[in-house]
Amino acid sequence: MENSDTDSEVFFWFQNQNQNHSHKFPSSCFPPSSHSAFYGSSSMINTETATMDEEDVCESYMMREITKKRKLTPIQLRLLEESFEEEKRLEPDRKLWLAEKLGLQPSQVAVWFQNRRARYKTKQLEHDCDSLKASYAKLKTDWDILFVQNQTLKSKVDLLKEKLKMQENLETQSIERKRLGEEGSSVKSDNTQYSEEEGLENQYSFPELAVLGFYYDPTLTASNLRL
């Protein structure tokens, strides 16, 4: 009877301990203990309490364990960096060789290379972006310089066109004046020749006077003779 009471007290004590600490270390995260094998798991004792948030807590615990496993020593990091610089891709044989050499799990080596490639690509993109920005700035500066030079040349061309137009106008006016001058000289010469011929004809308009030695002068008028 005394042994039966002692077993009952031990049973209830373990039950309370399981209920108080089930949120820290769920039974599904550990192998079954001798107590759970003898008395049953905490989920069998109190299913509602044991299953509450058990999956989340178990996942958190396993993530902490994985994080601890991923923590690498400086020597391991240096060797992994050297291997990454040699070859960015991780082949299966190389993964197993590195894991054995560094004392790591192959999955740890694979995850490290995956993260390292992601960081490498990010830095490469940043470098390419900076290079493109620098190239754009240089092209923009060159374009601004060429634009100013183009405007200057355009102004010079416009000025030369204006001067050429003025020169053409002057030449046209000179040719026109020369042409008009030649026409005026020709008309004057024709008029002079016509006047001389007309005077000779008028000299003999009155032959009876010509016999007496008088000749017709068309320039004579009554006012000239004061008649």
Curated annotation (Swiss-Prot):
Its main location: nucleus. Predominantly expressed in flowers and siliques. Residues 125-153 are annotated as: Leucine-zipper. One of its GO terms (cellular component) is nucleus. Residues 65-124 bind DNA. Transmembrane segments: none annotated. One of its GO terms (molecular function) is DNA-binding transcription factor activity, RNA polymerase II-specific. It comes from the Eukaryota. Residues 175-198 are annotated as: Disordered. It is found in: Nucleus. Keywords: DNA-binding, Homeobox, Nucleus, Transcription, Transcription regulation. It holds the Pfam family HALZ. Disulfide bonds: none annotated. Probable transcription factor. Belongs to the HD-ZIP homeobox family. Class I subfamily. This is Homeobox-leucine zipper protein ATHB-54. It comes from Arabidopsis thaliana (Mouse-ear cress). The gene is ATHB-54.
